[in-house]
C-alpha cells in the first residue's frame, strides 16, 4: 500500500489535484469514460485509491476539472490569436478554427459532458461555467467592437459554436464501423478534419457580419 502524507499547504493540495487530473487525462484518452476509475488513477499516481477522496468525491469531478483545464487553455489561445493583426471575418473564423484544432481533446470530453456534470458536485460545475461565461463575455465584446452584426446574428453565431462544441468531434472521428455503415446505407459523407469543419461552419455563422475597419 502506498504511504499517504496529507498535503499541508495550498500549493501541495493544488499539486496533488493536478497529478490526479493528469492521470485521469491519460486514462480517458486511452480508454474513454468507462476506463476512468479511482483505482486506475491510483495506479498512475503517488497515492492510493482511498486518498484520492481527500481531493475529489467522484471520477466525474476529476473529469470536470480536466475539461476546465482544457477550456482555459483553449480560451487563452483564442485571446492570444485575436489580440493582434487584422480583424476581418475570415481571420476571426480562422483563429478560432486553428486554436480549436489544437484542442481536439477538449471536444472529445464535451461528448461526455452530461455524464460528467451529472456525477459532479455543483462547485466543480460552477467553476467550469465561470470560465464559460468569461468566454461568452469576451467573444461578445470582440464582436461588438469589430463587426457590424445584429443581435440575432451574434446569438446565432454563439448557438452554432455551441453545437460545434458537442458535435464536431464525433463528426470528424467516425470509426471504421460507422464509416462502413454510412457507405452501406448510401448516406453521403465527406470525411473532414475538425479545423476544416470549424472554419466552414463559422464562416456560415458569420456570413452577415461586416468588419468595422
Place the predicted regions along the sequence by residue.
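Alpha-helical structural segments
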Residues: 15, 19-26, 44, 61-81, ...
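Solvent-exposed, amphipathic alpha-helical segments
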Residues: 23-30, 73-81, 160, 164-171, ...
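Hydrophobic alpha-helical connector segments
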Residues: 65, 79-106, 154-161
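Amphipathic alpha-helical segments used for helix-helix packing
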Residues: 100-126, 176-181
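Amphipathic alpha-helical packing segments from all-alpha helical-bundle domains
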Residues: 119-147, 196-199
